[in-house]
């Protein structure tokens, strides 16, 4: 299954990585590892994670206050947001 990050989601990943890197480079690396693990888990069983909004699903990163919001289109897994839990819920719906 192909995985594609929406440009805004990719920007959210980079912003979070930079924030962690400024405070703790190991935390920044751990964030990226956790996100890679999330992608692999979702790729293996995309329907396993709960629905979140219309047509989307949510994977909560266990060690960080972020959720990976994704949609499935045939053989494509589209990550539409990597949302911090303090952001307004559903801000990504127009993507």
What label would you give each PLM region?
Residues 2-58, 73-76, 92-95:
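Basic, Lys/Arg-enriched alpha-helical interface segments
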Residues 60-63:
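A short catalytic or substrate-binding loop motif that flags glycine-/basic-rich loops and adjacent residues
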Residues 67, 71-95:
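Enriched for short, Lys/Arg-rich terminal
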């Amino acid at each position: 299954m192909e995985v594609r990050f929406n440009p805004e989601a990719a920007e959210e990943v980079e912003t979070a990585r930079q924030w962690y890197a400024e405070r703790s480079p190991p935390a920044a690396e751990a964030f990226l590892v956790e996100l890679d693990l999330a992608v692999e888990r979702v790729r293996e069983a995309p329907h396993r994670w709960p629905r979140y909004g219309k047509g989307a699903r949510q994977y909560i990163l266990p060690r960080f206050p972020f959720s990976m919001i994704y949609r499935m289109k045939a053989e494509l897994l589209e990550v539409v947001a990597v949302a911090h839990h303090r952001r307004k819920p559903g801000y990504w719906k127009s993507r």
